[in-house]
Amino acid sequence: IDLDTMQLINTTPVLELNTHLSFPAILRREGHIYIYPENYAGGGLNLYEYLPESNECKKIKHLSDELVTDAVYTELFGEPLIFSTCEPDANGAVLGVYQQNKSTGMYQLVQECKFGEPIARNAGAWFTYRGEIYRPAQDSAVRYGHKLVIQRVRREADGCFSFREVR
């Protein structure tokens, strides 16, 4: 991208697989850049490290065998968690909470958050604002990704998560 004109000059793929890749979520940790793209057709969720010197990605860890879609990793609740919908109902009303198994390192489903409508699928990274946690979500009532909604997220005393749409 030309920073003066904001025009796209060139594109170079950094990760190419024989299966579908999308939703390239990015983590930055201790000077490293990690990417975990949606790739349920490839058999689950994998973590890649982006190597700027070669402009490519190297697979470093298999995170989950679940066929997660638009997964979001967060530590906003004091522990590493992944929130995601899952095939075959990726655009539905159930958001899975995945926790890391300490012995295997894999993320496993530990909770399901059920909505009354198809708004479970993530639409980007979660964020904080004025001490509250928010998540962008896709409203797929009409069709996949028809609208974007923002939900305030809280972890209740019983450990379950609650979501409230904000306007």
Task: Describe the residue ranges of each PLM region.
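Carbohydrate-active catalytic/glycan-binding domains of CAZyme proteins
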Residues: 1-167
